[in-house]
Amino acid sequence: MSKKSLSEDAQEVFRAIALIELGARMQVLESELTLSRERMIRLYREVKGVSPPKGMLPFSADWYTTWLANIHASLFYNTYRFLRDEARCSHLDALTKGYRLYLEHCRHNQTEPVLDLTRAWTLVRFFDANILQLTPCCRCSGKFIGHKHDLQHNVVCDACQPPSRAGKTKKAAAAKRDAQPQLVEVQHAANDVETIAVESLAAVETVAPGVFEEAVLAA
């Protein structure tokens, strides 16, 4: 086994840091990099300040076909494929750059990211294993993620035809509940202002009768 040069080792460290900053799990690092497990654990602790989490990685391809996850995953994978095929980036560079572009797109549109880096990495592996494929939408002509043996003709993507429950998430319901007391407070404040204005007008009219009538006639 040939020994790696210092520059190659440094590049591996930088790649590991980039993946850790984006939220990669240890299984992702071990699959993509040649650094020892001990070094990657040390890097993870230095970058994140905590030990790497344990547990299994996502393993179901069905998650990527649910309506909201499908839109986000399709956006990422089309970006990844462009960087790999058109920009000639390596797999790892396309993964990190594509995921950064995905996060930037979510921030620009003020949307919460649905896809984390581990799921993005798993998505690429599902495509490499021919479990998933890109299916063209018959309305927008965009390509979205579907199972390998799903229908290819006259299929509509979730962006063009979202389900009836779209937008009715727990977060949206919580935001609506939080906004309700604020609306009540604003209404009460408006009522208070109106009451104060009426009382002020009545007080002035009592002290100086006919003042407002003269002001209106003069106007």
From Swiss-Prot:
Binds 1 zinc ion per subunit. GO terms for cellular component: cytoplasm. Keywords: Activator, Bacterial flagellum biogenesis, Cytoplasm, DNA-binding, Metal-binding, Plasmid, Transcription, Transcription regulation, Zinc. Zn(2+) binds at residues 137, 140, 157, 160. The gene is flhC. Functions in complex with FlhD as a master transcriptional regulator that regulates transcription of several flagellar and non-flagellar operons by binding to their promoter region. Activates expression of class 2 flagellar genes, including fliA, which is a flagellum-specific sigma factor that turns on the class 3 genes. Also regulates genes whose products function in a variety of physiological pathways. This is Flagellar transcriptional regulator FlhC. Its cofactor is Zn(2+). GO terms for biological process: bacterial-type flagellum organization; positive regulation of DNA-templated transcription; regulation of bacterial-type flagellum assembly. It is found in: Cytoplasm. Heterohexamer composed of two FlhC and four FlhD subunits. Each FlhC binds a FlhD dimer, forming a heterotrimer, and a hexamer assembles by dimerization of two heterotrimers. InterPro entries: FlhC. GO terms for molecular function: DNA binding; zinc ion binding. It holds the Pfam family FlhC. Belongs to the FlhC family. It comes from the Bacteria.
